[in-house]
Curated annotation (Swiss-Prot):
This is Translation initiation factor IF-1. Component of the 30S ribosomal translation pre-initiation complex which assembles on the 30S ribosome in the order IF-2 and IF-3, IF-1 and N-formylmethionyl-tRNA(fMet); mRNA recruitment can occur at any time during PIC assembly. Its main location: cytoplasm. The keyword rRNA-binding applies. The lineage of its organism: Bacteria, Pseudomonadati, Pseudomonadota, Alphaproteobacteria, Hyphomicrobiales. It is found in: Cytoplasm. One of its GO terms (molecular function) is rRNA binding. It comes from the Bacteria. Gene3D superfamilies: Nucleic acid-binding proteins (2.40.50.140). The gene is infA. One of its GO terms (cellular component) is cytosol. Transmembrane segments: none annotated. Keywords: Cytoplasm, Initiation factor, Protein biosynthesis, RNA-binding, rRNA-binding.
Length: 72
């Protein structure tokens, strides 16, 4: 089965929410709610307010996403 199309956008974490969720402001001024990807949790990569991140989203729900990378 082919992997479904995902959209990737850079953004900035604006708020930490409960249950390892984050409010992220994308470069196109949209605000979404995102959680960290499994590999980031496994490697214990911390995400804090103000961090620049790469968010992966599905075209079906543009209000939720997955943080896949934290820029240095």
């Amino acid at each position: 089965m082919p992997k479904e199309e995902v959209l990737e956008f850079p953004g900035v974490v604006t708020e930490l929410l409960p249950n390892a969720m984050f409010r992220v402001k994308l470069e196109n001024d949209h605000e979404i709610i995102a959680h960290t990807a499994g590999r980031m949790r496994k490697n214990r990569i911390r995400v804090l307010t103000g961090d620049k991140v790469l968010v992966e989203m599905t075209p079906y729900d543009l209000t939720k996403g997955r943080i896949t990378y934290r820029f240095k």
